[in-house]
Amino acid sequence: MIKNYKLLLFTTFTLFFITFVSGSSILKANFYYKVDWENVQCFVPPCPKYTIQKLNTNEKSQKILDFIFPNGLNKTTLLGDESKTLIVLGTTQPSSKFPNNATDFLVTRVYKSLPLGNKQTSTDKYYMFGDNGTRCKTSPCPNIVAALLNVHSQEIINTISQPYEKNVGFLDSVWLSSKNIRSDDFGLIGQGTIKNGVISISNSFIYLPDPPIKCPELPLLKCVEGNSMTYSRDENRCLVSPRCTKFGVCTLSIPLCNKGYRLVSFPSTELNGCPKFFCDPEFVNKTHK
């Protein structure tokens, strides 16, 4: 009886998760696409410079004139050559400028690849990940659902292996790990290959905007002499838990960030008021200095 109930619970979750990641919970016409761009020159409009390719399929690519993005996104990181780093969820529609001979793309969600991933392999596919509810006393534990985007197919895996902690200095591993497995819309898309229960990610695509929620406003504390305001940083890169901390002895070394990343710091409670440094992707919103 208990075994059958667990099987029913797992099956129900699985069906829900496949529906969620396929985009059919929004509109049946919504699919995930990789974007490409070429700076072609045309003598007569319209002049579509973008193409989209439906993920995990062999369908023919489509030419796109314009993208219609949701409000609140920094479009300078999304258009032109930058668009080659995007995955978009949405649907095509007739162009507002040339309805009879051009196509626009109405974007529901947009994801951008983290710089300095690994070179993609011929076996890589695109996945999103969920928790299947399995709990184990030993590891590895097969508790991760890897759902193939645009395809009603999935695999159960035990490990998500990211390349970025090796490739990028001072990356916030808590921030990245929090995006691997989510129950909301804000999880990452992983391009990778599954073997023996492990997916080796070549590139991760981050949901935009990031963070997806507004950081909380913090009170301004009055600290006694010899103390200063310090913080922690949560999985959304927001400063939290302000407190007065006695000054510590700080090192003077300041790290350099890899290309595509910017240096940020904050007075850390963990480091007794000394600055804690991270290298955040340049395309995410700043949450502090």
Swiss-Prot record:
Glycans are attached at N74, N101, N132, N285. Residues 1-23 form the signal peptide. Keywords: Glycoprotein, Secreted, Signal. It is found in: Secreted. GO terms for cellular component: extracellular region. The keyword Cell inner membrane does not apply. It comes from the Eukaryota. This is Uncharacterized protein DDB_G0275255. It comes from Dictyostelium discoideum.
